Amino acid sequence: MMSFVSLLVVGILFPAIQAKQFTKCELSQVLKDMDGYGDITLPEWICTIFHISGYDTKTIVHDNGSTEYGLFQINNKLWCRDNQIQSKNICGISCDKFLDDDLTDDMMCAKKILDNEGIDYWLAHKALCSEKLDQWLCEKM
């Protein structure tokens, strides 16, 4: 009985990571403060994120010996730390923080990436999100 009570308390105090599949309009609302940052418009961000993660915070992609996490597909070699490889951890954060529904830390790291690498860090941007962006606007905002 004591084990069950202990497990119940742990479950209440430490809930599971809450991942989220955003819609275009939900994500537009959350990311509105990124509009214009580094001269990147909100529709450019929405388009890029759609193509790299499908608006899904739990997206993990393994590529060339590294791993990319979350909506912004932030790489573990430079930007965040995990238990897989040695990382510079420039954003000073655990990679698993990019898998939850709190995008505050994701946006802070994405801005740092943009400042250091530019928008071309996200390959989908140049190929798919640099023109004809009307479809990425949310009329509900």
Swiss-Prot record:
Organism name: Sus scrofa
Pfam families for the chain: Lys (PF00062)
Binding site for Ca(2+): 97, 100, 102, 105-106
Family label: Belongs to the glycosyl hydrolase 22 family.
Cystines in this chain: 25-138, 47-129, 80-95, 91-109
Tissue: Mammary gland specific. Secreted in milk.
Localization (cell): Secreted
Subunit structure: Lactose synthase (LS) is a heterodimer of a catalytic component, beta1,4-galactosyltransferase (beta4Gal-T1) and a regulatory component, alpha-lactalbumin (LA).
Keywords per UniProt: Calcium, Disulfide bond, Lactose biosynthesis, Metal-binding, Milk protein, Secreted, Signal
Protein name from the UniProt record: Alpha-lactalbumin
Coiled-coil parts of chain: none
Record domain C-type lysozyme: where: 20-141
Gene3D superfamilies named among the record's database cross-references: 1.10.530.10
Role, per record: Regulatory subunit of lactose synthase, changes the substrate specificity of galactosyltransferase in the mammary gland making glucose a good acceptor substrate for this enzyme. This enables LS to synthesize lactose, the major carbohydrate component of milk. In other tissues, galactosyltransferase transfers galactose onto the N-acetylglucosamine of the oligosaccharide chains in glycoproteins.
UniProt GO MF annotations: calcium ion binding; lactose synthase activity; lysozyme activity
Note: The pig alpha-lactalbumin shows complete loss of both lysozyme functional residues.
BP-aspect Gene Ontology terms: defense response to Gram-negative bacterium; defense response to Gram-positive bacterium; lactose biosynthetic process
Signal peptide: 1-19
Main location: secreted
Gene Ontology CC terms: extracellular region; protein-containing complex
